[in-house]
Amino acid sequence: MAEINGKTIETERDFTFSEAEYNQLMEEQRKERMKALRRHKLPEKLSLQDALLALTKQELEDIQYNLNLPMGNLNRTKKADMVAAIEPEVVNFVGRWFVSAFQEQKDIFDYACQHKGLLKDLQQEDYRLDYLRGVGVLYCGLQDGEMLWYMPEEIQAEYEKINNAAYADAVNLNTEVMRLAAGMVYYYGIIDYDQLYQKVCDQIDGELDFADFMGIIFNGGCWYPQVVTTEKDLMHESVMNPEALQTAQRQRGMVNYADFPYDKLFDAGQESYIESTEAYRALAQYFMKQKQLDVLQAAEAVNSINMILQNGYGMKEIMGFLK
């Protein structure tokens, strides 16, 4: 089985998918997520302690896990004891984590600090907020029936310690590094971190040590949907069978990764990027004229076919997708 643009596909027998089933599953997950988020009330005081006390024990354990903290028996541990143990660790963690932030994340943190910690205009459906919540940076709660996200006072204080011109430059570099890395896996599919580090460093002007690079990459793997981090490699989300791709790479022995110019990599690092070749434009025009698809539908169809071909499948699978 494989998944292309939300469509489950049988790649070994009949090439089929059920978009309706996929959409139903996504809707169920959305409802469960919102139900879980809306169980919390906005604390009167936006302190870190009150934010943590508002969480369930399971949610506190999730933060422990994400921060690689010691974990005891959940049923035998008092919630107050969990909060007392987690609170200083969250403060220590965010002080280190902020250095890997991207511009989009910085914009959120700046807004929070400018509005006493409150974030009123975030897209509630953005699952990436759950990542920031899972590492203790942001929290949420209901106020008069409205869902609000917020940054606790202690987290704001840690952020303000480093939020200066030098930090803004570092965030720009982080954003550039992740954009280039995402562009590379768009073309390569998958690449190990050592080689990725060397290739990214060849493209940038600033200095970057490997530890900082890995912090950027792992932050990016949780923030950018088009990339996936593994233990040893970064890969593009369109790769269906990374093991087969790595085997093919090893079989080619001394054949190196192709070099691409900076602009090409930077463009390819965009979310939902599609390289607009002549073949792409011709096929998209065909879908619009012959199948009455709109521009976005045609682009999605061409991108899906491109993913099928990139993953080693052929005309049989393409015809199955088009049925």
Predicted regions and their residues:
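Basic helix-extension-helix modules of the SAP/HeH family
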Residues: 2-150
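Short capping segments at the starts of secondary-structure elements
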Residues: 55, 103, 115-120, 186-194, ...
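Accessory beta->alpha helical hairpin/"wing" motif in late/C-terminal subdomains of nucleic-acid enzymes
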Residues: 74-91, 139-167, 227-247
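Short alpha-helical segments that sit at the start of domains
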Residues: 80-104, 162-178, 273-280
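Short, amphipathic alpha-helical interaction segments positioned at domain boundaries
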Residues: 94-97, 153-188, 240-267
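Non-catalytic interaction/regulatory modules that flank or connect domains
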Residues: 180-219
